[in-house]
Regions:
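Hydrophobic targeting segments
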Residues: 2-7, 23, 34-37
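Short beta-strand/turn micro-motifs composed of small residues
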Residues: 7-9, 39, 105
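Short, well-formed alpha-helical segments that are part of the catalytic scaffolds
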Residues: 12-27
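A conserved acidic beta->alpha catalytic loop
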Residues: 13, 38-49, 67
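A generic structural motif
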Residues: 28-33, 58
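Active-site-proximal specificity loops/subdomain of glycosyltransferases
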Residues: 49-98
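Short beta-strand-to-loop acidic/aromatic patch adjacent to the donor-nucleotide binding site
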Residues: 95-109
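Acidic donor-diphosphate engagement hotspot in glycosyltransferases and nucleotidyltransferases
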Residues: 112-113
Length: 113
């Protein structure tokens, strides 16, 4: 079984490591497991944490839109941009291996940890 975990993240520096560890543990039976997160508008050290994870785990990828709130004040619109990027990533040929998709919302990062 091959899993792709995608999601949007914001201000998750305190919980992202525990969350990834929890997902890794729950999916330890997977033949292949990869992560792709899209970040925007974090006020903490989320980008540093994501970068650290991407260097530590070869199956962890992320991208950042930086600060979208200056030009796009509505959070729902910013989320739509980030989620659409997750969809683009999922649909890319390099991810045709994925059999199952797991979508993680940023608010869950707090509750899973």
């Amino acid at each position: 079984m091959n899993f792709l975990v995608v999601g949007t993240v914001r201000n998750c520096e305190k919980n992202i490591f525990k969350t990834i560890k929890c997902i890794d543990k729950g999916l330890n039976f997977a033949n292949k497991l990869e992560y792709f997160f899209v970040e925007s508008d974090s006020d903490d050290q989320t980008l540093k944490s994501l970068d650290k994870l991407s260097k530590k785990k070869n199956n962890f990828k992320f991208m950042s839109f930086g600060s979208l709130r200056t030009n796009i004040p509505l959070r729902t619109e910013r989320l739509a941009i980030c989620r659409n990027r997750c969809l683009e990533y999922l649909r890319s040929k390099e991810n045709s291996w994925a059999e199952y998709l797991i979508v993680v919302d940023a608010f869950l990062l707090y509750h899973l940890s």
